[in-house]
Every structure is written in structure tokens, then in C-alpha cells.
């Protein structure tokens, strides 16, 4: 899929949601490297398992934390920690990511994140 095809795919699918499709498309492009680094077929935002009860994939990733003692829970586990400038640490760790059955399922889940208390203040700007 070309960059243009990926952007059109996301834009067309997100046009049905109550949010500006340009915002959703831009975020998907950044998070997935134009769809080249998506998780499974449809996780274009790199959304981790969290409280998800659906299918998951265990994928090695890099995380940045402010402590050298960050803990993960099995099956996630720290493979390596590297100290970075500024008191931060780079972790290499297999993480559980949500494995969606469709792009629409991913988009609806992504939108639901903005409705949670932590991001609720951003929801009012979804058409800007």
C-alpha cells in the first residue's frame, strides 16, 4: 500500500466518526509510519492491551521511562535497559498490543480513548 493509499484508507474510514478525519489520518501516519509499522493488520495507533479483553499480539518495542526500575507484568518483560541523557531510560520489552479485526474497530477504540477522563478536555476540539 502506498503512502497515499494508506492515508486515503484511514481518511475514508474515519469520515464516519464524530472527529475530524484529517486529525485521525495524521495521527495514524505518525504512529504507524504510513502503515508500514502497524501492529497486526489494523492496529495503526500502537494501542497496548490495557484492559482490553480481545485478541492480542506480543510485539517487541522500545519504551522510554524516567526510572531504571520500571516493572512490567508477564508475559511482558524487560529485555534491556539503557540510560539516556536527561535522566531517562530506554527499555526494550515485548508488549501486548490489541489485535483488531477491522480498521473500524481500531478507529472506534481510538476515539473512545479521547472520551476517558484523562483526555476528555481534548474531545471538545475534535472538529478543529
Give the role of each language-model region:
Residues 1-128:
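Catalytic cores of secreted/periplasmic lytic hydrolases that degrade extracellular macromolecules
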